[in-house]
Amino acid sequence: MKFSKLDGMKVVSLDAFRVGEISGIEIDTKRWDVTHIHIELTDEAIKELSFKKPIFGNINICLPIGYVKAIGDFVTLSRKLDGLKRIPECK
């Protein structure tokens, strides 16, 4: 699958909460494996995950690729929303 098809794709948690959209990926260049996806959070997800909404811009989290359950018309995660509370913000 081309990254261009994933870029901007909606991301939904296992409990059907709209988490956000894919905004990037991280690749281990030694093994040529995708290790993380970057998700730009929705305003609702920012609130539910207890992040502080910035005045400008958005919050992106770096989600380990193992959290992805399926990819179709949208990305389905293998965790409920509350299972994402310890995922760090991408810097």
What are the roles of these predicted feature ranges?
Residues 1-91:
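Peripheral interaction segments used for macromolecular assembly
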